[in-house]
A protein has these predicted regions:
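N-terminal pre-catalytic segment of deacetylase/amide-hydrolase enzymes
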Residues: 2-8, 18-94, 101-114, 256-259, ...
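Repetitive helical segments and hydrophobic/amphipathic motifs
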Residues: 11-12
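Short beta-strands and strand-loop turn motifs
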Residues: 22-29, 93, 147-149, 209-213, ...
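A broad, low-specificity signal for short, low-complexity segments enriched in glycine/proline
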Residues: 55, 79-83, 107-108, 146-147, ...
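Active-site beta->alpha N-cap acidic-glycine motif
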Residues: 62-158, 162-166, 173-176, 180-182, ...
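Catalytic domains of cell-wall/extracellular-matrix polysaccharide-remodeling enzymes
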Residues: 129, 153-286
């Protein structure tokens, strides 16, 4: 009950205004044990049992520094969620949650464009509907868009109908502005379970994307702290979590991008990173890690 009240409170903030950053503290990853989830209502879309529609691939212009990728690896069987990927090479994906923001997201897009880098944006449906032009720009400049729910609620605390609306309304808003259907989603707060991960993948056709690098930028509104934490903890195959609704996070990005690029990292979208994922035993032991900072 307490978790549900927290989720409803935070959802109200998004209802008030998408362009205003949340002030509530964002909890860490919440993983509900399978036995607890089994006591909740069955979740799934009205077309349960039918195969999900294949995501429509984005058609975008190559960025100025298009990353040359190796051939895709064979998709791991029954893998519904990812915190990071096992890759041959210094490939990483940086992700931004909770936008688009009227001011900070365009600023971030400018920073990415100047460097020819790609990112993945996990958008809140209400904000996506409010800023269709920003959504179009995200796709036009080569970035990926994922589903982050309609109103930023903890999806493991809602019933079947509410979950369906959270997912489908967000997908509809994304398609309305971009013509695309997302291939991945991120549950708000990381609130998920093995059962939900399977449902999102098999019923909605979206892999669940968590993270392996978290600068806690929602809590520590300091650009230097945010950049330092990302730089120190990034590793090949990392999925980096950040939030484009915070000015301090966006201000940290030039240092993050320039330092990690100088160390040899290659920024790709989440879907590109997933395509490179392979069993750990197949990843070459000699995969070079980027040169440590002086």
């Amino acid at each position: 009950m307490k978790r549900l009240l927290i989720g409803l409170s935070l959802a109200g903030v998004f209802l008030a205004a998408c362009h205003t950053a949340r002030t509530q503290s964002e909890p860490q990853v919440i993983v509900v044990p399978p036995d607890e989830m089994s006591r909740q209502p069955a979740l799934g879309p009205s077309t349960a049992g039918s195969p999900p529609a294949a995501p429509t691939p984005a058609t975008v212009k190559p960025s100025a520094t298009t990353v040359s990728l190796p051939p895709p690896a064979a998709a791991p069987a029954n893998k519904h969620s990812y915190n990071s990927c096992n890759v041959d090479g210094p490939y990483i994906a940086i992700t931004f949650d909770d936008g688009p923001h009227a001011v900070h997201t365009p600023t971030l897009l400018d920073i990415l464009k100047q460097r020819g880098l790609k990112a993945t944006f996990y958008v809140v449906g209400q904000c996506a509907a409010e800023y269709p032009d920003i959504m179009k720009r995200i796709v036009a400049e080569g970035h990926e868009i994922g589903n982050h729910s309609w109103s930023h609620v903890a999806l493991n605390s809602v019933g079947a109908d509410s979950l369906r609306k959270q997912m489908e309304n967000t997908n509809a808003a994304i398609k309305e502005s971009t013509g695309l259907r997302p291939a991945t989603m991120r549950p708000p707060y990381g609130a998920t379970s093995a059962r939900l991960n399977k449902l999102f993948d098999e019923e909605y056709g979206m892999k669940v994307i968590l993270w392996s690098v978290d600068p806690l930028d929602w809590k520590n509104r300091n650009a230097a702290t945010v950049s330092s934490r990302i730089i120190q903890n990034t590793h090949p195959g990392a999925i980096i979590l950040a939030h484009d609704i915070h000015a301090t996070t966006v201000a940290a990005m030039p240092e993050v991008f320039d330092t990690l690029t100088a160390r040899g990292y290659k920024f790709v979208t989440v879907s590109e990173l997933l395509a490179l994922d392979r069993p750990a035993q197949l990843v070459k032991k000699e995969t070079p890690a980027p040169t440590p900072a002086n």
